[in-house]
């Protein structure tokens, strides 16, 4: 057990012991004040309110989305190879050339 953990436990124990009498005194004072103000017996009155009527939202409109045809000259093989190449690039794509001269490290 670390040194600070021991200190923390000791402080918690002392605070807990000091707090117990304060809680009891607070409860007793609260009861006395409540009785003096006529709050000895509390009555809870619940009124039932009618549930608010919520109108149903209008249905969503149907939107016609034109289908996009494949661009001319582009087939799946090219796009698949481009994806593989980009994935294989990895960290290489994040590096900055030394001759760029920007002076900003990424």
Curated annotation (Swiss-Prot):
One of its GO terms (cellular component) is virus tail. The keyword Transcription does not apply. It is found in: Virion. It comes from Enterobacteria phage T3. Residues 48-106 are annotated as: Disordered. InterPro entries: Phage_T7-like_viron_assmbl. Transmembrane segments: none annotated. GO terms for biological process: viral tail assembly. Pfam families: VirionAssem_T7 (PF11653). This is Protein 7.3. Belongs to the T7likevirus protein 7.3 family. It comes from the Viruses.
């Amino acid at each position: 057990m670390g040194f600070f953990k021991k200190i923390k436990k000791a402080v918690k124990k002392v605070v807990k012991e000091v707090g117990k009498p304060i809680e009891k005194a607070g409860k007793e004072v609260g009861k006395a004040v409540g009785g003096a103000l006529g709050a000895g017996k509390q009555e809870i009155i619940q009124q039932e309110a009618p549930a608010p009527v919520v109108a149903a939202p209008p249905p969503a409109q149907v939107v016609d989305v034109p289908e996009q045809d494949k661009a001319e000259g582009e087939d799946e093989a090219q796009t698949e190879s481009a994806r593989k190449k980009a994935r294989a690039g990895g960290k290489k794509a994040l590096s900055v050339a030394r001759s760029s001269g920007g002076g900003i490290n990424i």
